């Protein structure tokens, strides 16, 4: 099948705001420096829902969404040397070419090699590998895992341990890696420190896990949904609070609880007002606040400059700061050796045909991650 078009099932988003439609699509063979992957498991993430809602200015339709997946290489295009058919892989929405100035700088993981075409929903040569009913269908985040087969750039693939369970490690393609890395890479949480985590969804739980692994002595979880508190404590939160239980601002509450503020705070929602609260809950002189959640396009953050003048640091993170191709295999190994949790993030499994139900579960707040088995 290597040089053949493959016909398979995919969940196509024909237009914004409508449920996904399971369709038969054609997936063209990989061109030079591309890899065609048989996806075996994929999860549903808020970023998929954000684009589907129509709020994403980079959103193009029709499109095949999905960016938390895992599978097996079916075939490779010309010039691909590091991957071969049969390899077990995780597609990556942040590539690692190893050559651009971003890849060569140890301070960042934001490879820019294919950023422009990826943002337009196209492969690096400016075209799509997907067609459905005679129409070209856009790619998404360079991954498009809501399809039985997908084509990705060879710099957007992590080769992983073939014994890893794909219906679990697919989550390392986004949420878990993002939250865990926000704590250990971006904030560089220190042993004995105090942390506050705003938003206790999948990413927030991964931040808590990262703070715990880094040796934080006190981790405060913050969410308006108290149903999430028990799970947060399982992951390592020392205590959990809801802003709705207090008459004063949540930052004032935290400053009082912690004798001046926390050493590290993390915003895992994408709400600019909460980002401000997280910064202002950080300790004067040394507190660090990390923006992990992605706010809607056009939103702006604000605080009084005095907050920064008096020694607080405001940072942001994408994919937890991990250089993707080299780091994801290591994260899989950390999971296999039980250093990090993954299974505990999976709150349910559904068949691929039930993908819209997985979105409903996510919106209800009742699930952390639902994994679809292809």
Curated annotation (Swiss-Prot):
Disruption phenotype: Mice develop normally but show a significant increase in whole-cell S-nitrosylation. Mice display increased tissue damage and mortality following endotoxic or bacterial challenge. It is an enzyme of class 1 (oxidoreductase). The modification N-acetylalanine is found at residue 2. Belongs to the zinc-containing alcohol dehydrogenase family. Class-III subfamily. Zn(2+) 1 binds at residues 45, 67, 174. Binds 2 Zn(2+) ions per subunit. It is found in: Cytoplasm. It holds the Pfam family ADH_N. GO terms for biological process: fatty acid omega-oxidation; formaldehyde catabolic process; positive regulation of blood pressure; respiratory system process; response to lipopolysaccharide; response to nitrosative stress; response to redox state; retinoid metabolic process. NCBIfam families: adh_III_F_hyde. Ubiquitous. Zn(2+) 2 binds at residues 97, 100, 103, 111. Catalyzes the oxidation of long-chain primary alcohols and the oxidation of S-(hydroxymethyl) glutathione. Also oxidizes long chain omega-hydroxy fatty acids, such as 20-HETE, producing both the intermediate aldehyde, 20-oxoarachidonate and the end product, a dicarboxylic acid, (5Z,8Z,11Z,14Z)-eicosatetraenedioate. Class-III ADH is remarkably ineffective in oxidizing ethanol. Required for clearance of cellular formaldehyde, a cytotoxic and carcinogenic metabolite that induces DNA damage. This is Alcohol dehydrogenase class-3. GO terms for molecular function: alcohol dehydrogenase (NAD+) activity; fatty acid binding; formaldehyde dehydrogenase (NAD+) activity; identical protein binding; S-(hydroxymethyl)glutathione dehydrogenase (NAD+) activity; S-(hydroxymethyl)glutathione dehydrogenase (NADP+) activity; S-(hydroxymethyl)glutathione dehydrogenase [NAD(P)+] activity; S-nitrosoglutathione reductase (NADH) activity. The modification N6-succinyllysine is found at residues 233, 315. It comes from the Eukaryota. Its cofactor is Zn(2+). The record marks 115 as: Important for FDH activity and activation by fatty acids. Its EC number is 1.1.1.1, 1.1.1.-, 1.1.1.284. It catalyses: a primary alcohol + NAD(+) = an aldehyde + NADH + H(+); a secondary alcohol + NAD(+) = a ketone + NADH + H(+); S-(hydroxymethyl)glutathione + NADP(+) = S-formylglutathione + NADPH + H(+); S-(hydroxymethyl)glutathione + NAD(+) = S-formylglutathione + NADH + H(+). InterPro entries: ADH-like_C, ADH-like_N, ADH_3, ADH_Zn_CS, GroES-like_sf, NAD(P)-bd_dom_sf. One of its GO terms (cellular component) is mitochondrion. Homodimer. The modification Phosphoserine is found at residues 247, 324, 351. Its main location: cytoplasm.
